[in-house]
Amino acid sequence: MKFIFLAVLVLFLLWSGYQTRQHPQLKFNSLTDRIANPLDTRLRYRIAEVDPRFKLSIEQVKSISQQATQIWQDGTGQDYFVYDPNAQLAIHLIYDERQIESEQRREHLSQLASNQQHWQEKKQQLDQIEQEIMRSKQFLDLKQQQLNQQIQHYNQEQQNARQHPSSFANSDYFQQRQRDLEQNVQTLQQEINQYNQKIAQLNQQVDELNTLDQQLNASVSQYKQRFKPHLFHKGLFNGKQIFIYEFESEDDLRLTLAHEFGHALGLAHAEDAQALMYPIMKEQNAAHFRLTQADRALLQSR
């Protein structure tokens, strides 16, 4: 009986070792899981902890994690993972200074974008006002030119009347002409005053825009100083647990989980910036991600 037990144990260990070489992820399953499911090569995992400050429930994270495992299944046709509430491999969402900084950075970026939009709208308004003022100036120049011609014509008529009094017997004509010209001069002067007032208002608004531009540049400088580029781990797989420290959206979380699942499959980092296993989550299409050839090559060569 003892011999049979030892033989079974040796066979199990040999089989287990062979399985682990063929499917490295199995070493992260518990011994009881492997005994209970000797032919199941999937990696079992569970959601152990979700800090409430992430504003996600465990069920929501579970759903997102299953979407992350689906990335691997869709890209390879193989089912590598299964959710098991009693699994040894546990996922923890840890809210610390990394997520705080990420949220503050996004808030600052949102405010900067809003300020830039406000500056752009104000500049467009001033550009329109400037164009209107330019059209007004052209109109006033033409009107002043026409008025000068009328005055010259009036002066010429007066000169002719003095030289030929008999031809201009009606003195009321010149009086009416003079009143009309004086009225036109007064009207033109009012329009010029209004034009100058618009110029002054425009200059004041340009000064305000320049001040806003300086404030915007200062905000950008403060942002760059406050949030200097540096590399930190969004997630970490330590062989027993997966820790998620930072994500910007559910899409980002799904991709980060899929990346850490890749490490659990025994994969190192890829050099393709669009690959799932690239060490920085930036160039990937988070919303509609598909495994790249670099990811599949890592899987085949593990």
Task: Please provide the spans of the model-predicted regions.
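Zinc-dependent metalloendopeptidases
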Residues: 1-302
